[in-house]
């Protein structure tokens, strides 16, 4: 079965797994999902990412992060969707929770946080926000 929005599917899998205190979550892999997972690891929202093969297809195994029994991710939400794409210039990139969260941006130089895109002076598609 094909998924209309693979990024929304990834975020939903992470959100659902964290709500039931799962240690790991597995999902189909893609270049974009790997890049988003890398940003989440760098920013400390998930513990680690491993790549595996299941039934001949590449999959990502994400190890979720918890603090005092609660998930580190309070909110993870898709912004730009297939039906309504959201593009912002460097000066208009969203500030999530006054800098305590991140927005993940797809730019011409790759996937990065809003802070990195702002400091590089480039805008792009606002994929999701995490706090």
UniProtKB/Swiss-Prot annotation:
Protein name from the UniProt record: Small ribosomal subunit protein uS8
Source superkingdom: Bacteria
GO molecular function: rRNA binding; structural constituent of ribosome
Keyword Ribonucleoprotein (UniProt): yes
One Gene Ontology term, aspect cellular component: ribonucleoprotein complex
UniProt-listed GO biological process terms: translation
Function per UniProt: One of the primary rRNA binding proteins, it binds directly to 16S rRNA central domain where it helps coordinate assembly of the platform of the 30S subunit.
Species this protein is from: Acidithiobacillus ferrooxidans (strain ATCC 23270 / DSM 14882 / CIP 104768 / NCIMB 8455) (Ferrobacillus ferrooxidans (strain ATCC 23270))
Family listed: Belongs to the universal ribosomal protein uS8 family.
The entry's keywords: Ribonucleoprotein, Ribosomal protein, RNA-binding, rRNA-binding
Cysteine disulfide partners in this protein: none
Signal sequence segment: none
Assembly mode: Part of the 30S ribosomal subunit. Contacts proteins S5 and S12.
């Amino acid at each position: 079965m094909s998924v209309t929005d693979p990024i929304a599917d990834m975020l939903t899998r992470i959100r659902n797994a964290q709500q039931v205190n799962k240690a790991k979550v597995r999902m189909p892999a893609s270049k974009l999902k790997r890049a988003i997972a890398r940003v989440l690891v760098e920013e400390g929202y998930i513990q680690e990412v491993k790549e595996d093969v299941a039934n001949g297809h590449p999959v990502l195994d994400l190890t979720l992060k918890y603090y005092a029994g609660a998930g580190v991710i309070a909110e993870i939400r898709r912004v730009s969707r297939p039906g309504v794409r959201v593009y912002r210039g460097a000066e208009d990139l969203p500030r999530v929770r006054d800098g305590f969260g991140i927005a993940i941006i797809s730019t011409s130089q790759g996937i990065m946080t809003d802070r990195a895109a702002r400091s590089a002076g480039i805008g792009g598609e606002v994929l999701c926000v995490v706090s």
